[in-house]
From Swiss-Prot:
Quaternary structure note: Component of the RNA exosome core complex (Exo-9), composed of EXOSC1, EXOSC2, EXOSC3, EXOSC4, EXOSC5, EXOSC6, EXOSC7, EXOSC8 and EXOSC9; within the complex interacts with EXOSC4 and EXOSC7. The catalytically inactive RNA exosome core complex (Exo-9) associates with the catalytic subunit EXOSC10/RRP6. Exo-9 may associate with DIS3 to form the nucleolar exosome complex, or DIS3L to form the cytoplasmic exosome complex. Exo-9 is formed by a hexameric base ring consisting of the heterodimers EXOSC4-EXOSC9, EXOSC5-EXOSC8 and EXOSC6-EXOSC7, and a cap ring consisting of EXOSC1, EXOSC2 and EXOSC3.
SUPFAM superfamilies attached to this UniProt entry: Eukaryotic type KH-domain (KH-domain type I), Nucleic acid-binding proteins, Ribosomal L27 protein-like
Record keywords, A-Z: Cytoplasm, Exosome, Nucleus, Phosphoprotein, RNA-binding, rRNA processing
GO biological-process terms attached to the record: CUT catabolic process; exonucleolytic trimming to generate mature 3'-end of 5.8S rRNA from tricistronic rRNA transcript (SSU-rRNA, 5.8S rRNA, LSU-rRNA); nuclear polyadenylation-dependent rRNA catabolic process; nuclear-transcribed mRNA catabolic process; poly(A)-dependent snoRNA 3'-end processing; positive regulation of cell growth; TRAMP-dependent tRNA surveillance pathway; U4 snRNA 3'-end processing
Cysteines paired by S-S bonds: none
Cellular localization per UniProt: Cytoplasm; Nucleus, Nucleolus; Nucleus
Name of this chain's protein: Exosome complex component RRP4
Coiled coil (UniProt feature): none
GO cellular component: cytoplasmic exosome (RNase complex); cytosol; exosome (RNase complex); nuclear exosome (RNase complex); nucleolus; nucleoplasm
UniProt organism field: Bos taurus
Keyword Nucleotide-binding included in the entry's annotation: no
Cytoplasm recorded as keyword: yes
């Protein structure tokens, strides 16, 4: 196995211009946002000497007279309707604890999920005893945020057939602030793989199924070997997502696909080299700018 090691002095510094939005007002803790007293103080700010000062590093967002700072690197703050990817950490009475990259563990109630086969009925004691047969510790799931409690904890549900247990694939963890909010977060890419872009920063990359298992009730038990071609596509997509996240570019289906196409001249293992990563991301950014016109 070939290994490549570089000394810190030999590494090329990444371009600071990449991943930065010129239109956004970036601040660090202690920066003065405004001296106008007509604005309301929001999250990530505080008043000091009649000035509105940032308390976290991030971008300034204004809604009418409300000013807040959205942190660039933070834990996931759940919102109703968000699509998330999570990992089961504990099986409890009539519920599962799920790790979703938030400050507190999320909760998936037994009554908030589809039974295998999509059967609709009241949950019985037999269902409660068979909970570990449905989902056990370590299983990955896709779900939707049903409610957010006062302490910030999130309640999930998987009642739709497109949610449920995930099969074979690769999990990539990025900052939640890099995942662009869209109408749908389930994408079948033309390269032969699919992605689930969780609003919580967990991205699931998996081979596109030949037929949709709508009758499985959200439970995927496909354990057939994945072909070498599919594994190479998934590995390339994974490295492209890591490259975009390293350069602080927003992640959505178009940016990931453009980055994948830009990486095709290079070997999969070389994509994460700093100079190649910068070249690929610059080409991706240029194509996105041309598309926007």
């Amino acid at each position: 196995m070939a290994l490549e090691m570089r000394l810190p002095v030999a590494r090329k510094p990444l371009s600071e211009s990449l991943g930065r939005e010129s239109k956004k007002h970036l601040v660090v803790p202690g920066d003065t946002i405004t001296t106008d007293t007509g604005f309301m103080r929001g999250h990530g700010t505080y008043m000091g000497e009649e000035k509105l000062i940032a308390s976290v590093a991030g971008s300034v967002e204004r809604v009418n007279k409300l000013i807040c700072v959205k942190a660039l690197k933070t834990r996931y703050n759940g919102e109703v309707g968000d699509i998330v990817v999570g990992r089961i950490t504990e099986v409890q009475q009539k519920r599962w604890k799920v790790e979703t990259n938030s400050r507190l563990d999320s909760v998936l109630l037994l009554s908030s999920m589809n039974l295998p086969g999509g059967e609709l009925r009241r949950r019985s004691a037999e269902d409660e005893l068979a909970m570990r047969g449905f989902l056990q510790e370590g299983d990955l799931i896709s779900a939707e945020v049903q409610a957010v409690f006062s302490d910030g904890a999130v309640s999930l549900h998987t009642r739709s057939l497109k949610y449920g247990k995930l099969g074979q694939g690769v999990l990539v963890q990025v900052s939640p602030s890099l995942v662009k909010r869209q109408k749908t977060h389930f994408h079948d890419l033309p390269c032969g793989a699919s992605v689930i872009l969780g609003n919580n920063g967990f991205i699931w990359v998996y081979p596109t199924p030949e037929h949709k298992e709508d009758d499985a009730g959200g439970f995927i038990a496909n354990l057939e070997p994945v072909s070498l071609t599919d594994r190479e596509v998934i590995s390339r997509l994974r490295n492209c997502i890591v490259s975009l996240a390293t350069q602080r570019m927003m992640l959505y289906d178009t940016s990931i696909l453009y980055c994948y196409e830009a990486s095709l001249p290079h070997q999969i293992k070389d994509i994460l080299k700093p100079e190649i990563m910068e070249e690929i991301v610059m080409e991706t950014r240029q194509r996105l700018l041309e598309q926007e016109g």
